[in-house]
Amino acid sequence: MTSNNTAHRSATKRLFKTCALAAGLGLMSLPAFAGDSALYGPTAPKGSTFVRVYNASSAEISASVGNTNLNEVAPLGSTAFSFMPQGDYTAKLGSQSVPVKLASDHYYTLVNNASGKPQLVEEPPFKNKQKSLVRVQNLSDKSLTLKTADGKTEVVNTVAAKGTGEREINPVKVSLALYDGDKKVTDVKPVALERGEAAVLYITGSGSSLSPVWVKPPVATR
């Protein structure tokens, strides 16, 4: 009898330990999921519009779109994309304001130029997970071609002034340059092209004073 009681007590203790462990794991799982939410941030509601800022000037600026503050933006720096409801807004970049119309499910970059008014540039999202995308946003006053630094291979065919061009390529780290015909205009900072990402080269300025800058994070839906 004593042996049976002892066995019963041992089984009961094991059961309590198992229940306690299960309860502990259950309690731990709640903050774990909460942590995931904090880590990845809120999900954009269906029909949202997405906008970021690229500061092409040599001075830090503050930026906002409507009531959405996009924080301080360093010289030649950019923000991550922020989402908001579609609609008409006033964008403020530094001391300048510009009206913008933002459509649902569209991506945009607001460019703060070194001189002149800010510009709103649409950025179609890139969805190919196997390739990289090189996109050229040519906001300058001349047609330009993006080639390998040695000029032997065209990466993005000639892009007209105020135009856009792009090409999907395999992921690679590459040194590139801008050409006006066969004449090299300027080298471009090397960029590491990642699978499933778009590297967007913004070219601002005019004449012989051009400023090519890669703007990342990329336009990508994941």
Swiss-Prot record:
One biological process term in Gene Ontology: alginic acid biosynthetic process
Signal peptide feature range: 1-34
GO cellular component: periplasmic space
Entry keyword set: Alginate biosynthesis, Periplasm, Signal
Pfam families: AlgF
Main location: periplasm
Subcellular location: Periplasm
Pathway stated in the Swiss-Prot or TrEMBL entry: Glycan biosynthesis; alginate biosynthesis
Family in the record: Belongs to the AlgF family.
Function: Together with AlgI and AlgJ, forms an inner membrane complex which probably interacts with the alginate polymerization-transport complex and adds acetyl groups at the O-2 and O-3 positions of mannuronate residues. Acetylation of alginate is important for the architecture of biofilms and increases the ability of alginate to act as a defense barrier.
Name under which the protein is recorded: Alginate biosynthesis protein AlgF
Origin species: Pseudomonas syringae pv. tomato (strain ATCC BAA-871 / DC3000)
